[in-house]
Amino acid sequence: MPEKYYQVGKIVNTHGIRGEVRVIATTDFTEERFKKGTHLAVEMPNGLTPVTVSAMRQHKQFYLLQFEGLGNINDVELFKGHNLKIAASERDDQLEDDEYYYGDIIGLEVIEESDGTSYGKVSEIIDPGPNDVWVIKRRGRSDLLLPFLKSVIKKIDIEAGKAYVEVPEGLIDNED
């Protein structure tokens, strides 16, 4: 079975002429994910291209990364617009029992705990303020936004691919 990879960022551009790339992070562990010596992979159309971080610095809302052996803009130009991933085996941080990686949550089927109604699947997680918000894609309806609160998200079963919720009254419009 091939190893699982998780997205940690998106390469949006090059920076300068010395092979730096500009990355928008999609991980909460930027210092760990982008530190010198970390093995990552660029998701290219023909597969994953392995890279090793040789330098990292923050610049405005971006992270500027340089990769070993790729010290010229021409070496990294083809990475623009592609996702940056990390192998599951490279993730060495320990999560608490009630903490999850975004990549583990995205794609879960969201089910009403009380009656088994399926609302759809988590398509993304946004961070608008004090707590994360799950964006649930619903067929033929507008997206459902659920705050990541213990009063709303009742149970997460990563193995089964399901999250059980109790949607507060008034959060869902009657769109029938």
From Swiss-Prot:
Where is it mainly found? cytoplasm
Gene Ontology biological process terms, A to Z: ribosomal small subunit biogenesis; rRNA processing
Compartments where located: Cytoplasm
Per the database record, which ranges form the PRC barrel domain?
A: 97-171
Entry GO terms, CC? cytoplasm; ribosome
The UniProt GO MF terms for this protein read: ribosome binding
Q: Which keywords has UniProt assigned to this entry?
A: Chaperone, Cytoplasm, Ribosome biogenesis, rRNA processing
Query: Which Gene3D superfamilies did the record assign?
Result: PRC-barrel domain, RimM
Which InterPro entries does its entry note?
A: PRC-brl_dom, PRC_barrel-like_sf, RimM, RimM_N, RimM_N_sf, Transl_B-barrel_sf
Briefly state the protein's biological role: An accessory protein needed during the final step in the assembly of 30S ribosomal subunit, possibly for assembly of the head region. Essential for efficient processing of 16S rRNA. May be needed both before and after RbfA during the maturation of 16S rRNA. It has affinity for free ribosomal 30S subunits but not for 70S ribosomes.
Oligomeric and partner information: Binds ribosomal protein uS19.
Record text about domains: The PRC barrel domain binds ribosomal protein uS19.
Family per similarity comment: Belongs to the RimM family.
Report the protein name in the record: Ribosome maturation factor RimM
Organism, by scientific name, is Latilactobacillus sakei subsp. sakei (strain 23K)
Q: Mind giving the lineage of the organism this protein is from?
A: Bacteria, Bacillati, Bacillota, Bacilli, Lactobacillales
Recorded name of the encoding gene = rimM
